[in-house]
From Swiss-Prot:
Organism of provenance: Mycolicibacterium gilvum (strain PYR-GCK)
Pathway in which this enzyme or protein is active: Cofactor metabolism; pyridoxal 5'-phosphate salvage; pyridoxal 5'-phosphate from pyridoxamine 5'-phosphate: step 1/1; Cofactor metabolism; pyridoxal 5'-phosphate salvage; pyridoxal 5'-phosphate from pyridoxine 5'-phosphate: step 1/1
Binding-site positions, substrate: 11-14, 75, 132, 136, 140, 201-203
EC number from the UniProt entry: 1.4.3.5
PANTHER family: PYRIDOXINE-5'-PHOSPHATE OXIDASE, PYRIDOXINE-5-PHOSPHATE OXIDASE
Subunit structure: Homodimer.
GO MF, one example: pyridoxamine phosphate oxidase activity
NCBIfam families for the chain: pdxH, PRK05679.1
Gene3D superfamilies: Electron Transport, Fmn-binding Protein, Chain A
Protein name: Pyridoxine/pyridoxamine 5'-phosphate oxidase
Length: 218
């Protein structure tokens, strides 16, 4: 396959712009712990104007052993891992039920940074799900009830009718309950890698695994 010229012209030289940072990522940055550094980088991405800096690309494996990716929002970060919420009956839910492992990548292109987290996936507790659910806007709660995620539908009009039906169903309810098919997943932080783009593709990669911090070749 030949390389397209217009794609080649999109090449970016890392490490030369102020936004990339003048200090090289090193293992001692992890002295504060990977959780603190991930939160710090997320905050810096937000301050730099990155939209939804908590967005992460989550990869799962389908029934044929093929990878599937999608972007979701990270909703918590602690020593146990990172969490997100979704429809358990969705394709990703079925994939995680069959193969409970996933990887997640936070791509902050504007800053020339990425963080990768991978490990075993478990459902968060019903209490954690209920707590997060209570903080969601009512419209988002109704949308979770209305959508049979990943299932085909005839038209957008049909989808909006499902939303209208759900809205009417809960019209007299002050607090919309958590759907039985909806909740959170926790990706255990078995491996966490911090990546910083540098000049000439000699990037910085620092990995945390089993408590050990080590530099990887780019």
């Amino acid at each position: 396959m030949a390389t397209s010229d217009h794609l080649a012209r999109m090449r970016v030289e890392y490490g030369s712009a102020e936004k990339d940072g003048s200090v090289d990522l090193d293992a001692d940055w992890l002295d504060i712990g990977w959780v603190a550094l991930l939160n710090q980088w997320m905050t810096e991405a937000h301050d730099a104007g990155v939209a939804e800096p908590n967005a992460m690309v989550v990869a799962t494996i389908d029934g044929e052993g093929r990878p599937v990716t999608r972007t979701v929002l990270c909703k918590s970060v602690d020593e146990s891992g990172i969490s997100f919420y979704t429809n358990y009956d969705s394709d990703k839910g079925a994939q995680l039920a069959a193969r409970p492992y996933a990887s997640a990548t936070f791509p902050w292109y504007l800053l020339g940074r990425q963080v990768h987290v991978r490990g075993r996936v478990t459902k968060v507790s019903a209490e954690e799900t209920a707590d997060y659910w209570s903080k969601r806007p009512r419209g988002s709660q109704l949308g979770a009830w209305a959508s049979q995620q990943s299932r085909p539908i005839a038209s957008r009009a049909a989808l909006m009718q499902q939303l209208a039906d759900v809205t009417a169903r809960f019209a007299d309810v002050d607090e919309v309950p958590v759907p039985p098919h909806w909740g959170g997943y926790l990706i255990a932080a078995e491996v966490v890698e911090f990546w910083q783009g540098r000049e000439n593709r000699v990037h910085n990669r620092i990995r945390v695994r089993d408590g050990a911090v080590e530099r990887l070749q780019p």
